[in-house]
C-alpha cells in the first residue's frame, strides 16, 4: 500500500468557480481582499502586506489597489466571471479597492457595506493623547 504524503492529503485542489463573493476588509493598517465561493469557502486571498508593502505604505490606497488587482487577477484565472462585493471597515483603501475590482472586468451583481455599527453597545476606548 502506497503512503500518501501529509501535505498532499491536506492540500485541496485548486477550485474553479464562476460566481463568488469578494470581501474587502479595510483597516487603518492594512487592506485584506478575500475571494470566496457562494457558500463562503475561501478560494484565495490577498493583502497589501502580501503584495510587498511594509510599514506605513501598507495602509495607503495604492497598496489596497494593488492587493485588489492581485486577488481579482488570480480569481479570474480560476474562472471567476460574476461576483458580489462585501466591504467592511473604515480604512483608506476601501474605495480604491472597489474601483480596482470594477475596472478588472468581473461582473458585479451588487456591492454591500457590511461594516459593523454598534447600536450604543460597548463603551469605546478613550481617545488618544499624542
Swiss-Prot record:
GO terms for molecular function: rRNA binding; structural constituent of ribosome. Gene3D superfamilies: Ribosomal protein S11. Pfam families: Ribosomal_S11. GO terms for biological process: translation. It is found in: Plastid, Chloroplast. Keywords: Chloroplast, Plastid, Ribonucleoprotein, Ribosomal protein, RNA-binding, rRNA-binding. It comes from the Eukaryota. Induction: By abscisic acid (ABA) during heterophyllous induction. InterPro entries: Ribosomal_uS11 (IPR001971), Ribosomal_uS11_bac-type (IPR019981), Ribosomal_uS11_CS (IPR018102), Ribosomal_uS11_sf (IPR036967). Coiled coil: none annotated. GO terms for cellular component: chloroplast; ribonucleoprotein complex; ribosome. Belongs to the universal ribosomal protein uS11 family. Part of the 30S ribosomal subunit. NCBIfam families: PRK05309.1, uS11_bact. This is Small ribosomal subunit protein uS11c. It comes from Marsilea quadrifolia. The gene is rps11.
